[in-house]
Amino acid sequence: MTSKLEQLRAMTTVVADTGDIEAVTRLKPVDCTTNPTIVLKALGTDMFADAFEEAIKWGKAKGGASDAVTEAIADRLAISVGAALAKIVPGRVSTEVDADLSFDTQASLNKARAIIAQYKERGIEKDRILIKLASTWEGIRAAEVLQKEGIDCNLTLLFSKAQAIACAEAKVFLISPFVGRILDWYKKSTGENYTSETDPGVVSVRQIYNFYKVNGIETIVMGASFRNAGEIEALAGCDRLTISPALLDELDAATGDLPRVLSPEKTTPDPLVSLDEKAFRWALNEDAMATEKLSEGIRAFAKDLGTLRGMVAKKLAA
């Protein structure tokens, strides 16, 4: 009997949400996604011990423990993780712009271009990389500029249709609407339990997918942030799904029929709308879940980036 993972691969591009080299080698995803949390975890393993020491040596040669050098080393380390993944997967690796730049369009542009330049120095062209940006108004504006420069973007921390509409208008390459974090918010807020069909995160991604397909929007929809395999199965047929190694293993071990749920041919009317900055900010403000989870996600990624920079600073001072 074919595993559910193999059945999923037949209708959806499977992406691994990890920096675990062993898991990526074993599970053979098409793409990989990373974020500051994943990078921090990967750098704590023996696999990247040499890369860490090499980056510290480079930093000391650049003058040592200044904020600028510390930040540059953290960037190099994130790219070391991404470059290692790019050697394994045939597709793209997503590398995230610093979370503390989420409300600064120009700084996000500068960092994104620097990331692409560093990958190129390692022989990895921009068509192998996706620049991850938070789906703030400023992040979306940065993505709009980068797309025109031929740098494809992955808009993350996306919790609402308003964010998805703004990303579509910016013609971004790919969005990552979150599932599990939406479920977390509703379970905490209502005290209720949800099935895969009533899961608010699943419902959100289905609505966004439908809106894109019925209106001919080319931006790729990649569901992200899963709490259980049921959420993944409920989105079978989505353009892409980025999944943790643990859930990929669970799907690989599971058998039984996996029916296609999402398809461009199975859509319902949902009129195309446009959002300017005022309308975007108001729509986000009116959505308590999206507002809270976006802010929380940015804070969490910024905290992990700060932890990495702290580790670097300590090593530089040693």
Swiss-Prot record:
Annotated InterPro entries: Aldolase_TIM (IPR013785), TAL/FSA (IPR001585), Transaldolase_1 (IPR004730), Transaldolase_AS (IPR018225)
Keyword list, A-Z: Cytoplasm, Pentose shunt, Schiff base, Transferase
Pathway: Carbohydrate degradation; pentose phosphate pathway; D-glyceraldehyde 3-phosphate and beta-D-fructose 6-phosphate from D-ribose 5-phosphate and D-xylulose 5-phosphate (non-oxidative stage): step 2/3
Localization per record: Cytoplasm
Reaction(s) this enzyme catalyzes, per UniProt: D-sedoheptulose 7-phosphate + D-glyceraldehyde 3-phosphate = D-erythrose 4-phosphate + beta-D-fructose 6-phosphate
GO CC entries: cytosol
A Pfam family: TAL_FSA
Presence of keyword Cytoplasm: yes
EC code(s) of this entry: 2.2.1.2
Stored PROSITE patterns: TRANSALDOLASE_1, TRANSALDOLASE_2
MF GO annotations: transaldolase activity
GO process annotations (BP): carbohydrate metabolic process; pentose-phosphate shunt
Organism superkingdom: Bacteria
Active site: residue positions: K132
Purpose of the protein: Transaldolase is important for the balance of metabolites in the pentose-phosphate pathway.
The family this protein is said to belong to: Belongs to the transaldolase family. Type 1 subfamily.
HAMAP family on file: Transaldolase_1 (MF_00492)
Record's protein name: Transaldolase
Species name: Allorhizobium ampelinum (strain ATCC BAA-846 / DSM 112012 / S4)
